[in-house]
Amino acid sequence: MKSKYLDNTEVKKLRSAMSCEEWLPLWVSLETGLRVGDVVKLRPRDVQKDGIHYVAEKTGKKGIAAIPQILRRELSERKGKYIFPSYRSADKHLSRQAVWQRIKRAGKRAGVDLEGLSPHAMRKAFAVELYRKKGFKVVQEALQHTNTATTEIYSFADWDTGENANLPLRRRDLRLVVRMVLEALGEAYKMPKESQKKGKEE
């Protein structure tokens, strides 16, 4: 079973099939883990010396996402109401759907498996790489997840081989398999106590 996320090679292929303008919002998501819906709403004032200041639309949580200097310079040069203005009006931001169309077109040109493509593609790639390097807790904090089950999804990026797994393999496999089977049967999956916190996440 192959996880639905883009590996480094696929990300590079996708980048090569896009213009700089098309790639920029995805680059932000890849570097920060921000949802595309939050990226497209960014304004020039949100880009500061310590990173991107944002409020997550789904949770209402405030955060500061660190970004490399080269990306900060690129974003700082953007003028207008929004960093990513709509094609139709500079007073409106680019839509999530427009970004999704860009991803699909670039994916087809690059020959990337469309199964791994979605508006969340860069957020997933960010989470998987961060999980491999820093572990579960760091990813949970970076993505602002209150429900540990949501973060655990990213720990299964290599669940077919168990490579780079920081959680006990038996526990990880069992939990995901049970969840998948019950959801397929239309049954609710009752998470362990530490995972029952409510929150709007993805």
Predicted regions span which residues?
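Conserved tyrosine-mediated DNA breakage-rejoining catalytic core shared by Y-recombinases
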Residues: 8, 32, 41-74
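DNA/chromatin major-groove-contacting recognition/catalytic segments
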Residues: 1, 5, 66-70, 156-193, ...
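The alpha-helix within a helix-turn-helix
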Residues: 29, 40, 140
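Short coil/turn motifs that cap or connect alpha-helices
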Residues: 35, 113, 146-149
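Short, basic (Lys/Arg/His-rich) helix/loop patches that form interaction surfaces
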Residues: 16-18, 101-141
